[in-house]
Design a protein with these regions (language model features):
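Glycine-rich beta-alpha junction loops
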Residues: 128-129, 186-192, 238-240, 330, ...
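Aromatic-enriched
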Residues: 22-23, 188-217, 221, 364-366, ...
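Active-site diphosphate/adenylate-binding microenvironment
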Residues: 32-35, 40-44, 50-53, 58-62, ...
C-alpha cells in the first residue's frame, strides 16, 4: 500500500514510452516535458504544428517523446484546420501547435471554424517570456484576448506549477458539454522552468457543469405534444453525431413514425435509405423537405441551431408548428426560433428518456403526403447530356463505392452537390464545415 515516488531531472525510458502514471511516480520535469506527459495522459497521438522561436523548447522535448507524432504544416492555419479535421474524423480531441505573434494569429480562422461547428481542439501557443508580456516585445500578441470570442475557453499560463492542471482542464472543457476549441498560451520561460509533475486525475471546475439529462417535466410536456401532433417532423443536427445518438434517433423515429430531416452537418445521423428519411432542408435543400417543415404542426429539433440557411426569414419559418428544442447548450435554445418546450441536455440521454415517455405513433397519412411532394419535386434531376456534369460524377462515385466511403469537402457549390447526390447511411461519413 506504500506509494513509490521516483525523482529524476530527465524523463526515464518509461516516461518516453508514455508509461508514467500519477499513481506510480512523481517527478521533476521541465514545462515542455510536462506538456508532452499531459498529452500522452490524454491519449493524444498526433500533433499538427509549425515551429518558431517561442516554442522551440517544446519541440526539443517532443524529440524525446516518440509516441507523439508531429505533423509539420506549411502554415499555422493548416495546423488548426488539420486538428479540426482530425477531431471530426477520429472523434478525439485535435491538437495544434504554433509559436507566438504571427504564428498564433494564423490559427485564428481554424479555431473560429472549430468553434462554429462544435469541434474539440486544443491549441497550444508559445508567447514571449513572462517578464516581456505587455511590453510590445518581438512577436508578442494578446492571443488570449484575440481568441476570447472564438474559443470555448482559453488560458495564459504564468506558473509552471499550473501547467498540468490547465491542460487537464483544457481537454476536459474541449470534449465535454458542447465541444469546442480551447487555447493554452504558454510563455517561453514556462517551457524551461522545472517543477514536480503529477497529473491530476480529476478537474475542479465549479462553474462548469454541463446538463446531461433532460428535465423530467419538460420530457413529459414534449411527450404530450408528440402524442397530439398530426404532422410532426424531426430536425436532426450535428449534435446527434457529437453525442453518438444515431441509434437512439432511429429508435425514436421508428417508434413515433415521424420523418427525419438531417441538416448539412447532421448528414449520417439517420440513414438516408430509411423510409422515414427526408433530404437536407434549407436554401440548398429539397423543396419537399422545406414544404414538410412549413406545413408541419410540430418540429422536434435535436442538436441543431436553426441556422439562417435553414430558416430563411425567421418570422415566416414553420408558422403552424410548435417546437421542441433539444440541445446541450442552453444558449442555443430560443436564440433563433422560440421553443414551445425547451429541453437542455445531451441528445443521446434525452432521446433515451423520450423513447420511454412516448407512445407508438402512426403518421402514414402525413408521410404519404410528403412522399407525394417528393415524387413531384425531387431534390434534383441529373439530365442525360454529352457533357460530364459534376453532379453526375458524385452520384457515380456513390454508386461505385456503394456509399462505403468518407466524403470530405471544402465549402462551396461542390459541397452542396456532395450533400445532395450522396446518400449518407453511416454516421461521421460526411466531413464538412
Amino acid at each position: 500500500g506504500r506509494e513509490l515516488f521516483f525523482i529524476s531531472r530527465w524523463p526515464s525510458p518509461d516516461l518516453r514510452q508514455g508509461r508514467l502514471s500519477v499513481r506510480e511516480a512523481t517527478v521533476k520535469l521541465k514545462g515542455a516535458e510536462i506538456i508532452c506527459e499531459c498529452l500522452l495522459a490524454e491519449g493524444v497521438e498526433v500533433i499538427f504544428g509549425h515551429p518558431g522561436g517561442a516554442v522551440l523548447p517544446l519541440y526539443d522535448a517532443l524529440y524525446k517523446y516518440s509516441q507523439l507524432r508531429h505533423i509539420l504544416v506549411r502554415h499555422e492555419q493548416c495546423a488548426a484546420h488539420a486538428a479540426d479535421g482530425y477531431a471530426r474524423a477520429s472523434r478525439q480531441v485535435g491538437v495544434c501547435l504554433a509559436t507566438s505573434g504571427p504564428g498564433a494569429t494564423n490559427l485564428v480562422t481554424g479555431i473560429a471554424c472549430a468553434m462554429m461547428d462544435s469541434v474539440p481542439i486544443v491549441a497550444i501557443t508559445g508567447n514571449v517570456p513572462t517578464t516581456a508580456i505587455g511590453r510590445d516585445a518581438f512577436q508578442e500578441t494578446d492571443i488570449t484576448g484575440i481568441t476570447m470570442p472564438i474559443t470555448k475557453h482559453n488560458y495564459l499560463v504564468t506558473r509552471v506549477e499550473d501547467l498540468a492542471r490547465v491542460l487537464k482542464e483544457a481537454f476536459h472543457i474541449a470534449r465535454t458539454g458542447r465541444p469546442g476549441p480551447v487555447l493554452v498560451d504558454i510563455p517561453k520561460d514556462i517551457f524551461l522552468k522545472e517543477t514536480w509533475f503529477e497529473y491530476p486525475e480529476t478537474v475542479n471546475l465549479p462553474g462548469y457543469k454541463p446538463t446531461l439529462h433532460g428535465n423530467a417535466r419538460q420530457i413529459r410536456a414534449a411527450a404530450e405534444l408528440i402524442a397530439q401532433a398530426q404532422r410532426p417532423v424531426i430536425l436532426a443536427g450535428h449534435g446527434v453525431l457529437i453525442s453518438g445518438a444515431e441509434a437512439e434517433l432511429r429508435e425514436f423515429a421508428e417508434k413515433t413514425d415521424i420523418p427525419v430531416i438531417c441538416t448539412l452537418l447532421g448528414l449520417g445521423a439517420f440513414p438516408e435509405s430509411h423510409e422515414l428519411s427526408l433530404a437536407m432542408p434549407g436554401m440548398h435543400g429539397a423543396a419537399y423537405s422545406n414544404l414538410a417543415i412549413h406545413e408541419s404542426d410540430l418540429i422536434i429539433a435535436i442538436g441543431m441551431r436553426f441556422d439562417d440557411r435553414i430558416t430563411g426569414k425567421v418570422e415566416a419559418f414553420a408558422p403552424k408548428a410548435k417546437v421542441i428544442h433539444i440541445d446541450i447548450d442552453p444558449a442555443e435554445i430560443g436564440k433563433n426560433v422560440k421553443a414551445t418546450v425547451p429541453i437542455v441536455g445531451d441528445a443521446k440521454l434525452v432521446l433515451r428518456e423520450l423513447i420511454k415517455a412516448v407512445q407508438p405513433g402512426n403518421h402514414r397519412d402525413w408521410l404519404a403526403q410528403i412522399w407525394e411532394w417528393r415524387r413531384k419535386m425531387p431534390l434534383t434531376v441529373i439530365r442525360e447530356t454529352d457533357k460530364l456534369l459534376p453532379q453526375y460524377v458524385i452520384r457515380k462515385l456513390y454508386e461505385i463505392t456503394g456509399g462505403d466511403a468518407i466524403v470530405v469537402t471544402d465549402v462551396g457549390q461542390h459541397q452542396m452537390w456532395a450533400a445532395q447526390h450522396w446518400w449518407y447511411d453511416k454516421p461521421n461519413s460526411f466531413i464538412s464545415s
